[in-house]
Amino acid sequence: MHPPKHITSKTGLGLTWTTKVFETFPDHFITDETFGEMERLWSIDDLVVAKPGYRWITKWEEGKNYVITRILNEKGDWVGTYCDICSPVKKIEDTRLIGNDEGFEFEDWYLDVWQPANEKPGLLDEDELEEAVADGHITREQAEVAMEAAAKVIEILGSSAI
């Protein structure tokens, strides 16, 4: 295992964060992002999920149709778990995004799973998924895979096996 690498990122959105690559394995790695300055807070269903001091710990797993992120507040308390449903995560090399020699990428398939702390997980953005199919951004087959992946994530989160 290599020591964690750090990179501080800044966007045109008035947002800064620091990413540490915690652990690197052949088929996955775990990142830990801590938010710095922000022009506005990010929320899901009126629950703040990103503000200065909040951390997103993300598991990127090659070949999976999802990326799971645990969200912690500035005290380290669990706020919730957010999951992007996506094309199969694939390994890429020489990425500057995470400050590591290797990384993973995916294509977002519009559907997400959200689990607030101590509650059951549920789907987000089903309407966006259907719009994406209707507009030709993704295929009906990809949408079906997305729904299957979301069901799998809900099962995983429901069993707390992440």
Stretches found by the model and what they are:
Residues T16-W17, D108-Y110:
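Short beta-strand-initiation
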Residues V49, I57-D108:
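Structured beta-strand/loop patches that form or line metal/cofactor-binding pockets in enzymes
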Residues W109-K152:
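A hydrophobic, small-residue-rich beta->alpha segment in the mid-to-C-terminal subdomain
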Residues E148-I162:
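Cysteine/selenocysteine-centered motifs that mediate thiol-based redox chemistry or coordinate metal-sulfur cofactors
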